[in-house]
Structure formats: C-alpha cells, structure tokens
C-alpha cells in the first residue's frame, strides 16, 4: 500500500502524546485487546499499523529517547503490547535540556539510528511518509528530533515529513532554562527539512479546558490525551483515498514554502452538540474565532482551512483540493488568500453529546507566536546566558553560527507573513 506512514516518537513529550495517539487509533479501529482485528474493524489498517507474524497489529512507530523512564512508563500500561523494546532507540544519556547535546547525541549514534530506521523501512512497501511527535522545548525532543528529520530528508529526499510539535509556554514560566535557544534551533531545522508542522501549546489547551469547565483538575495526561485524540481524528482521513501529502497540501499551498505551520480547532472534544450546525461561511468563521485552540483568529487572516466533520466522506470534494495545489501566485492571491475556504474531506468518529466539527487551520496569527519566540531568544542571547553549559563540548563559535543562521531563517518566516498580510 502506497499510504504507509512511519511514525517517530521523540523525547518525553513525543512518547506520551504519541502513545495517546495510538490508543485513540486502537479504539477507533475496534482492535481487540490482543490487537487483532475486531468484528467491525476496517481492513486497511496498514496505513499506521503493521501485521505481525501472530496476526495482530502493532503501530509502525519508532521511539527515540535518551532516558528509559518514559518508555518504561508506557510499557507498564495496558497498551504495552503495542511496543517492542528491541525495535526502539533508548539510551541512558543526559542532554541537560540542550538542543545541541540532543542533536550531537544523534550524530554520535548515527550508525545505530541508521540501523533501527532501515530495519523498519525495509518492511514497508514504500517510503514516502513520516509523522514525527516531538517538543521544541527540551534537549531530546528538540535536538535529537532535528537530527532525525535531517537524516530522513538526506536519505529519503522524496519523502513527506510532518511534525506534530508541542510549543512551550511563551508568556509564562518554564522549567527549561534554555527553552528560547531550543525553540529557535528546532523551528529553523523544521523549516529546512520538514514539509509541514501541526503545532500545539500546552498552556493554550489547559486554558481551553478550564474555560469550558471540562474538569477542575488539569494534568499533562489530559492535555496529552487531547493532542493524541485530535491528531488521530485528522489522520483518520488517511484510511480513505488521501495520503498524508494530499491531506496537508491544501494548507501549505502558498508562495512561501516556509509558511507551513497549522493548528487544530478541537471543538469536537470540548463543546456540547449544537442544535443547528452552521451552514454559512460567516457563521463558521465566527465559530472558529471563539473556539480556536492556539491562535487568536481575529488578529490575522486565513491562508487556508480544512474542515473535517461527521458527515459521510464525499469524494467529490477531493477535486477542489487538487485544484488549489496548481494555483500560480497571482491566482493564489486573488482567489485563495483573500477568502475563507473550507473543504469537507472526512468522517470523524461520532461522539454522543459532543460537537463534531474539527478544523485544521493555516493562519497568519501564527506570526506573533514566532515573533515572541525570537523576542525571548534575544533576551537570553544578548547576555550570552548559560552558553558555556548549553554548548557543552560544542565550540562556542560554532554554536553562535548556528544561532545566527537559525535566527535569520525565522526572521525570513516573519517577513513572509508580513508580506502576505500586506495583500489584505
């Protein structure tokens, strides 16, 4: 099957959010407790799963971490059968929450990384799609994942790489002192080597849960569940005739290749079912302004949007997606950029008493997010704070070169958003 996806779960956040993603897929596909097909299970599960010799399905995923703690945590759960420790990259190292140390740990173990990846890839019919769960905050999730996506791009240049990344709290306290350094380097690497990024912010999800009074007690587990669940809803589209690339292409079709950051509206999980579904574009826009997960949609403009609903899958709508991809720049600005656009392409899991509208959005309101990342970075860098510890064995001059080039790349992204906004 040409739609097979290899998933990478990198670092603590990648492991835990990815684990919730797999748990959601297992429930949605009605796999039995031994991970064999249930009575009503779909037959095309090899998009995300591979069938073992014992005729049960296991996730096509590789876990990369420089500590055993979080992997041991999921191996004690009821879903431990999903993972085989011998297939994963688990070391006992300490990155000290440094992107540089995580990145160079990948280089130091390049032969082991190559061996693990190639063994999994050899079992696939084609190597086209990679899905990466990570954080841009810490050393492993940011640094090691940057090495991995660079490795994939260099060795599988025609592949499509999507990252599901957790962004840090940019306005509050953080437990990671080096977070601004890590974020700048990680975003730059994703821009250079990835095709798309679906991003989340923990504090934004926590605020949304509190606002909707879902539960008085918040925890990382609940936030990870929300992230894993929403990604499974989006990716469930791939059980139809869509590939990872054709799903996301409508969101990233614009004259600037590095404007590929999208977010998710998770109204499907949080709001009670409305008596009347919005039918007009204006109503949908107003609704999105109220419940978007990460961005203030009133402060910017849509580049593109995909709607996923509980209505039956309409193949007819696929044509409008493919048409968008071939817009030249002039038609893009005149016909796509200046209007809100939504395409129905999937049937979500029905959940009683809950709304069934989910949106994947590419919006210019992401611009203030990366501007804040640069602002936090400059506050730290102008004092060269903690650089000696952060760099470790890496030469300071080399680190400063990486910082300068990464910052310049992100400033280009900011400039491109500003250029697009000038057309409104």
Curated annotation (Swiss-Prot):
One GO MF term, please? GTP binding
Which key words are in the record?
GTP-binding, Microtubule, Nucleotide-binding
Which Pfam families does its entry note?
Answer: Tubulin (PF00091)
Asked if GTP-binding is a keyword of the record, the answer is yes
The cross-references to Gene3D superfamilies, in alphabetical order and at most eight, read: Helix hairpin bin (1.10.287.600), Tubulin/FtsZ, GTPase domain (3.40.50.1440)
Described function = Tubulin is the major constituent of microtubules. The gamma chain is found at microtubule organizing centers (MTOC) such as the spindle poles or the centrosome, suggesting that it is involved in the minus-end nucleation of microtubule assembly.
Task: Report the protein name in the record.
Answer: Tubulin gamma chain, nucleomorph
The source organism is: Guillardia theta
